[in-house]
Amino acid sequence: MSISKSLVLNEIKKFSPSHIIIGYSGGVDSSVLLNISKELDIPLIAIYINHNLHRDSLKWQIHCQQTCQRYNLQFISHSLDKVPKGESFEAWASKQRMAFFQKIMQPYSKPLLLLGHHQDDQAETFLIQAIRGSGLAGLAGIPHYKELHHGGVLRPLLKYSKIEIEEFAKLNNISYIYDDSNEDIKYRRNLIRNQIIPILQQVNPNIGQTLSRSANICAESNNILQKLLTERLQSISQDTNLIISELIKLDDDIQKSLLHLWFKQNTQQSLKSKQIKELHLAINNPSTGWQIDISNYYQIHIQYNQLIIKYPTTINDMSKEDIISWLSKNLNEEIDLTKIVIRDRKPDDKCKYRGRNKPNKLKILFQELQIPTTERSKAKIILKDQQIIAVYPFFICG
């Protein structure tokens, strides 16, 4: 199937965007998308994100800028900082790119972000998610269209293969850059693209199309499931709380799915399989006062007949600044603020006070250090990598 320029243009037009933002890397996918989209009578902004990883990244930026000048289009470049230690570059960079796109989209009434993902990207994503053991939502892969906080993101080339995109570029004399880092198999996606997909093509020459179709089926099935679960969730909820006696009337699998959906809707975060199992066990043997930590930010409590999410305590900027300043003075090491979490004290919090071999509950330490009860309420727990490293403004742990 060859790319139909008119179909792609009509697909974009049906969203009636006030402005079009294109993620433009200079690669063949985004170059073809830019070439097609420039024919629309809609203000268009091309954005180049410089990841500062490749020796030629500045050359690519200049290529993109010159192409936009030739097309008479607005061009914006943005340079990413160094990825924080311990974070996946791919996941971090994806978040950074989307955050910048949203920043550019913010002033416009109905902006539409266009990205050049294609069928081969979808096939690779399906395999990545399958390897992770993902469920329907993960296997659904890359969405064709998705609402964003402001505007939406559309991938008009998602049904076309990489070969079809390259053929379009050749027929239309579209110049583009080639990123040789795509051959580096230390990245999982490159390993799948360059080594696993070719093996699968020996079994099924149309493996890209087949896996993409499977992703679409998963997406459709997941949409149906989410609609049905959302309706059921509304019937067993009171405000943002879950009514336990109503939830446990349902089949176990439905209970677990509703627990996942309930938490996702209220926090925009996902529960891990282990956490869902713990929650499921707890609601079927409910005990008032039971609680579970879900990351450093959230707790889930059972209070009488309801399951309740405890949200993070808001610490104003001045208080946080004071806490970080205190930590810097008392902790003899460099602090990576991206890994620091500050929260209120919990009953079971423990700290290994300096010079001791094992941790003690904070209540015991407060008593031993003769910290007045009236002062203890001021305590803020400082965590790094989910470990308590200090109790502000009293002492350092570890």
From Swiss-Prot:
Example of a GO MF term: tRNA(Ile)-lysidine synthase activity
Listed EC numbers: 6.3.4.19
Residues where ATP binds: 25-30
GO biological process: tRNA modification
Entry function: Ligates lysine onto the cytidine present at position 34 of the AUA codon-specific tRNA(Ile) that contains the anticodon CAU, in an ATP-dependent manner. Cytidine is converted to lysidine, thus changing the amino acid specificity of the tRNA from methionine to isoleucine.
SUPFAM superfamilies: Adenine nucleotide alpha hydrolases-like, MesJ substrate recognition domain-like, PheT/TilS domain
Subcellular localization, as worded in the UniProt entry: Cytoplasm
Higher taxonomy: Bacteria, Pseudomonadati, Pseudomonadota, Gammaproteobacteria, Thiotrichales
InterPro entries the record matches: Lysidine-tRNA-synth_C (IPR012796), Rossmann-like_a/b/a_fold (IPR014729), TilS/TtcA_N (IPR011063), tRNA_Ile_lys_synt (IPR012094), tRNA_Ile_lys_synt_N (IPR012795), tRNA_Ile_lys_synt_subst-bd (IPR015262)
GO CC, alphabetical: cytoplasm
Assigned keywords, A-Z: ATP-binding, Cytoplasm, Ligase, Nucleotide-binding, tRNA processing
Annotated domain remarks: The N-terminal region contains the highly conserved SGGXDS motif, predicted to be a P-loop motif involved in ATP binding.
Family, per entry: Belongs to the tRNA(Ile)-lysidine synthase family.
Organism field: Francisella tularensis subsp. novicida (strain U112)
Catalytic function, reaction form: cytidine(34) in tRNA(Ile2) + L-lysine + ATP = lysidine(34) in tRNA(Ile2) + AMP + diphosphate + H(+)
Keyword Nuclease among record annotations: no
Uppermost EC category: ligase
Name used for this protein in its record: tRNA(Ile)-lysidine synthase
